[in-house]
Each structure stands twice: as C-alpha cells, then as structure tokens.
Amino acid sequence: MRSKKMTHGLEKAPHRSLLHALGLTREELARPLVGVVNAANEVVPGHIHLDDIAEAVKAGVRAAGGTPLEFPAIAVCDGLAMNHEGMRFSLPSRELIADSIEIMATAHPFDALVFIPNCDKSVPGMLMAMLRLDVPSVMVSGGPMLAGATLAGRADLITVFEGVGRVQRGDMTEAELDELVEGACPGCGSCAGMFTANSMNCLAETIGLALPGNGTTPAVTAARIRLAKHAGMKVMEMLERNIRPRDIVTEKAVANAVAVDMALGCSTNTVLHLPAVFAEAGLDLTLDIFDKVSRKTPNLCKLSPAGHHHIQDLHAAGGIPAVMAELDSIGLIDRSAMTVTGRTVGENLDALGAKVRDADVIRSVDAPYSPQGGIAILKGSLAPGGAVVKQSAVAPEMMVREAVARVFDSEEAACEAIMGGRIKAGDAIVIRYEGPKGGPGMREMLTPTSAIAGMGLGADVALITDGRFSGGTRGAAIGHVSPEAAEGGPIGLVQEGDRIRIDIPARALDLLVDEDELARRRAVFVPVEKEITSPLLRRYARMVSSAATGARQR
C-alpha cells in the first residue's frame, strides 16, 4: 500500500509519531488510509453542505475497513464572481485545485482517495487530479439545488440574472425582482439547471468515475447522504481490486461522455473541461471530435436555460442512466466501458433497469428536440481555430444570420452599451480581449447575455467573444473564438460596422471583409496589452494554451 511509505519500517517511526499526534491508533494506521478531499466552504451555496457529505463518506470508508483522513480544497462560486475582477480567477482555479490536490496526495501518500466537489471548476479540477495521481478513487459531488418556487412560478439563478434586463426594459418592477431574488435559490446545492456544475457532475457519472445518481440526486435528500456512504465503501473495493482511474478513463469513456454531453445539452464549458480532464490520461479530445459526435447524437433534453425543466426533473425521469439507455438503443454508448461500480456501463444499465420515466423531460431518440447534439463547433474566417455555441439554446431565427458588428474590448464596455439601450436588433456584439491569455482568465459573459435575453433581444442579437459563457447562458452566444485577440486572431481585426455571417447548421462563422482590407488591418494591428497586477494571472497568461485545446496550462 502507498501509505506504507509513511507508516511502516524502523525509519518511519517519526512519521508514525506525527500520525499518532492526530489521535490515530495503531489499529487505524494498520488499515488502508483514504484521503477525503473536501471542497466545503461557507461562501459557495453548492459547497455549504459538503461537510455532511464528507462525514457520510468517512462513515462509508470506516464501515468497509479503512481509515479516512480529510483535507480541504478551494472552490469559487462563478455566480458570485460574475461581472467583476474575480471572474478572471475562476478558470485558473481549475489547475490550482488539481495541483494542490496532487501536492497533498503525494506528500501524504494515501492508498485511495474520495473527491467531494460540486461547483464549476472544482469538478474538472478534481477529475484532473484523480487521473494525474491514478490511485483508486471515487468522486461524489454535493448534488444539485432544487429549483426555486416563486409567485411567478419556478425559478433559478438565471431567472434572476435575466430579471435585471427585464427591470431595465420595464417588464418587471424592482419589487418583483426582490421577490425573485429571495426565492430563486432555495438552499444548498449546485444551481438547479444544466449549467456548468451540473453538466460536469453528470459527465463524471457518465465517464464512470462517480456512482450512478451522482449527477442528479438532489443535494437536500437522504439519498445523497446514502450515495456518499456508498462512495466511501466503494473506494475500498476499488483499492482491493486495484481498479484505478486510468483503467476507467479510456477512449470508450471519452466517446460516452461526449455523446451524453450532446444529448443533455450541457454547458459549453464542457468543451474546455473535458479535453483538460482527458489529457491527464493521455487522451486527445479535439473540437473536431466534439462536432463529429454532435452531428450524429440527438438532443434529448432541454433543461434550464434551454427549457423549463431542472435537474430534479431529470432525476425523476430516470437520470443519466436513462439518457444513456436511450442513446444505447441506437448504438451511441459503449457498454463495455468500466466504471467505479466495478461493473461495465452495460452491466450498470441492466442492473438499474435504466429507462425513461418521463418522455417530456428525456425525449425518445425517435422524437428528439433536435437530430443533432446541444453543442456545435463553428469555424471560418472569424474563427479559424474554432468557436463554440450551445445550439440547443439558440432561437430558430438566429441559427442563420448576417449581423452588424458592435465592437468592445471588455465585458464592462459591452454591458454598459446593452444596459444603455445602444444595442438594437440585427447587431452582433463582439467582445474581445477576454480570452485565456488576453483576459487573462477567460471570464464568463453571463451578465451581457442575460441582459440581452431579459431585454427581449434574444432572437435578434448575437454575442461573439474570445471569452466564454456560463452554462446558464442562452441565445446566439458564440464563445471560445480562436485564436483569441491577444494572440493576433481575426477577432482582433473586427471594426465597428463590419458584417458577420453566422450559419450554425453549416458550422460557419465568417467576417465579411475582403482579404485585401484584412491584410491592411493586420499590417497595423497591435494587440491591446492590459496591466496585470496579479502575479497569479501574470503566470497564467504566460502558461495558458488556446481555448481550442481546453485552456490548459502548459
């Protein structure tokens, strides 16, 4: 066992002395030592309850004959970090989470690990660490928040974001917004729609690194506590059988994850996170693979923000196993992929009797919302390296559109124009210098997209950026434009009034300016250089790769 490096042998007597100082007995040190990585904090609603999950995990580890040892991980709430300087630090936290766990689990060689994340970057960060360390591991997340119940009906955080635009437009009073503010987020859990956190938690289950039910079991239920106990017990089985994360994360898992991603209509942030996660296992997930899978995978779900259903509805309809079973019926799931249950995907689906219980929430493959998946990859003269759009959340009128460029070099400048009523139907808002390097940090553009939707412009205005979007964004929001402006990409050459053509079915994004004019602009182009006062962000800007490859740190 790995832990013998610090518990066994004459020369490890000082190590044992330190471990006894923790209150551990000889009997406890004789058992496998299981690290429990807990991202609990009192800042993030999705993490406020994770101590309860950790206690359940530790109970499961002890029940199966192990000794649990808990240590912390950081987590950022993207909602609280939105639309200010803090959002620059969200994506960089992904690698920081992975690195810090690698440090802790190598300095203190545990025999196995249980990972407890919940919100946006904590899930991919922990998955990256899990694959990097490759010791027997299980992930169990904190679970989704329930949707809010308000006088106007069901609500979630995105309802509040869009409410700001509705007040600005005059469709909602500030008193009505206040009522929404207090009711939209009723308690603990990751925000209730198919936003980034829930997208990644569902995909962790799909990949096989979390138990069935991990992605959709509500945070406030006893079933979530039982799931955590089972995770603690299951990691001991993984240790006994020496099943490691890289035994599970193979090309088969990649194919399953991308197919389910497309069927669910997950966040576009999965196009950043999945390549970064799979790279830790030596696997290359490209934009072309995403698009190839999207073209043949039906979109079976329209969860908030694309529709009115929430994660609790997906859970009641059969959850991720039901979605996988539906895709399996047309050969889009590899049933032979291994999982942390110790069984294959196919064996899990059979044992669970996986089936769709509500065909309104999970459509049949014979009657999907769309014959193609939720995400599309666009390329063209404006994005030769690629761009990403959640096509399942785009209004039909915006699938093919020629628009007039309104150019802004920051999110703040664009928001000021939107809120000031200076954006009109037929415009394409271009926000640049918000990419991984140019931001730096690749901020989410949820505030401007929510303002567009709230002001009733969602079917008339596009937003194009080298930044990224929240999983809660809807509309013609095209992000991850590569190369980014700071790297000399064509988005840096766009001028006010240029015409841009969007053709999502044809996967095209083009700047309608002739090549001679672009050459003249390129000859005098000088990228905007921002003053970066944060040492962390300076390092990040130097080390980060393109969004087209997952914005990984080199």
Curated annotation (Swiss-Prot):
Pfam families: ILV_EDD_C, ILVD_EDD_N. Its cofactor is [2Fe-2S] cluster; Mg(2+). Its EC number is 4.2.1.9. Keywords: 2Fe-2S, Amino-acid biosynthesis, Branched-chain amino acid biosynthesis, Iron, Iron-sulfur, Lyase, Magnesium, Metal-binding. Belongs to the IlvD/Edd family. Homodimer. This is Dihydroxy-acid dehydratase. It comes from Nitratidesulfovibrio vulgaris (strain DP4).
